[in-house]
Structures are given as structure tokens and as C-alpha cells.
Amino acid sequence: DFQMNGNEMGTALQAGLNPVILIINNASYGTIRMHQEREYPARVSGTAIVNPDYMAIAAAYGFHGERVTGTAQFADAFARACESPTGAIVEIVTATEAISPRTTISALRAAAAP
């Protein structure tokens, strides 16, 4: 989770490194939500989050920043991020429903249904 270790951008900046950081933003603590949905379908608590403006964070560190909202945008955004001389954040916005690359909230609920 980027919000648990985003301060390492300052260390990278100080060390002269140029990291490319990919943030998958589904507006939730997805791993916790996945366990809640599997064990207690539709009874979730404390997993929806309001994220900060990651582009503003990128700018604050002098990094390149891009927000991607569709698959077709990713390749070009990633290429630009890799070309950045100062590091970059690429925020990939996904739906909360897409809880992981392999499943959805609906699928978890359906599998847990009696």
C-alpha cells in the first residue's frame, strides 16, 4: 500500500534515484475487503478509503505523474514515466469491484452464497 511507504520517495529523491511507482487505486484496502467478502459476504467494515491526490504528491517531489483510467492509456503513460529524469508515479484507477486480478466482489459473494 503506497500510503504505508510513500515517504520512501523522499529517500529516493535524496539518493538521486528515479523510481517508477505504479499505484493500483481501487479506493479500498482490497486484501482486507477480499477476506471480509469471502468470510462475511456483503458485511464489510473499514475498507473503503479516500485516497490523496497522487498527482499532487508526484509534483511535490518533482516527479512526473499520470493518472490512467483505461487500459489503452497505460503503455504510453508507462513509457513517459520511464523516460522521466526525476522519477514518476503512474496511478492506475480501477473499479472497487475488481478486487484482484483474478476475481471480483460479485464472484466472491456468489461463491460464498449457500
List where the protein language model places each region.
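Thiamine diphosphate
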Residues: D1-P114
